[in-house]
Amino acid sequence: MLQTYTATTRPADGPPRLHALRAALSAQGVQGYLVPRADVYQGEYVAPCDERLAWLTGFTGSAGFCIVLPDRAGLFVDGRYRVQARMQCAADFTPVNWPETKPAAWLREACPNGAVIGFDPWLHTPDEVETLEKGLKDSGITLKRLPNQIDALWTDRPGPPMGQVTAHPEDLAGLSSEEKRRQIAQALADAGQSATVLTQPESLCWLLNIRGADLPRLPVVQAFGILHADGRVDLFAHEAKFDGLVLDEGVHLRPPEAFEPALRTLNGPVRRTLNGPVRLDKTSLPLRVLNILRETGAEVAFMQDPCLLPKARKTEAELAGARAAHLRDGAAMVEFLCWLDTKAAQLVAEPEHVLTEIDIARQLEAMRGRSNELVDLSFDTIAGSGPNGAIVHYRVTEDSNRRLLPGDLMLVDSGGQYRDGTTDITRTIAIGPAGALEAECFTLVLQGMIAISRARFPRGVAGGHLDALARYPLWLAGRDYDHGTGHGVGAFLSVHEGPQRLSRVSTVPLAEGMILSNEPGYYLEGRFGIRIENLIATRKGEVPEGGDARDWLEFETLTLAPIDRRLILKDRLSREERAWLDAYHARVQTLLTPLVSPEAGQWLERACAPL
């Protein structure tokens, strides 16, 4: 099995580690320290050796940070993780609502004038540090760069990952690495830039048509790179990871320790490789990289990572791969949902029957594995029953594993990594008869999901413009959810990909080929969680009859699996909403029936019957 269920942290471990950290800070004459979740690559997924926040606090969520002071430790988490943080962390760590509470404001209130706060410049971006310093202006509180303080205390810290790198075939990528490098290099040259420093492994893997095995759930190699305006690439990674793999001409593999010296030769008075500034993305770059370049007198230009938008706009080959992956994944989901319905009926008839969250996660992984094409999960399966469903990113462990009960809602958010695509799907399933409140909230969430699915919009519209469509039915009922409506999704890369999002803060215009999730939800702490998620691909839309001859866009739904009709209040749906759902279910049945067992096919026919 790919997913394990042993708890990796214990609340009791936090207080003695916090005490040791405070002693180390006191010895260095600093009054505080920043402990981020991020590693040097600033990604969502980190290797076990980089789980510093979890080691200190016990919190295992994918986003957050801790500010340690002599008399308090604030754990900053967003709305997805507030319940989880309270469950995983000792009382020595105080959850702080973020981003509602800004770190600078918290420090101003908590620290005396003259306090010095330490941080590791490899683990924070220039954007983060500039924002914090601006917020602390005139407070008397200063930031100080320090060697990593957690690493000095973590005596049994695991070693760095050494997964093998493989080629990603051009027939799946749609473009050769040479074509991609030429395209990005030309953009640099057109902007008068000499090079760009690439610090996000997903960008490098996309650019070079390679995939790695350094991280669970994310098929990347941990590496840094420098792309020059003439198309050359210096790739800084351990040679042992590339055993037997021949890189393209113009791609030079160099050891990780050569990265800093290479930065010092990029563009400065001492030596210039090419004329023009070095392009840096200060939202994802380690601050230390910028510091090194400034030490050499290099000229820099702050712009977005030039690989992000081309990577987000999938080629026709990548879209075809995504459709194939979703057919395969949809068949696995149907087999799983058929199995779960059978088990749920048995549970209702025989209350002594035992069915747990781990049973569900294991069964779903087994169903996906039957295709023999599953490389990995795209994230640890979220299998939250009853009150655990209200923990947005709940990860079941042997300690938290809950027995399902009749009347529960079962929220299952899962996905697979296949060589031709990445999937992410959420279904909320009734375990026996559901309550009136559960059905009402499910219907509101469904209406929001359908609104995004049916959206037609002119070119130039961003995800921030569409986010409210998914929330509006909930808003009318005085309800909402504390996460974005959707995130970008990669092509056998990260299940969470930018820069596009369906979120009220997103300003990135949507464009053809962008794949996003569509996943509104509703969570009632202590009771239940509801989320319905499909992946959608942005495509060119038809001009409505009698409409303006504008450049319209719309969404193609990629995900294929029934939505639990037992939780739908049919009379609450409009005629258009019912028509969309019936058409979606008809398509699901047509495409998946040939791919599933006879038993699952019969179940699918019932699950997809018109409302």
What are these language model-derived features?
Residues 1-611:
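Active-site neighborhoods and metal-handling regions in enzymes and metal-associated proteins
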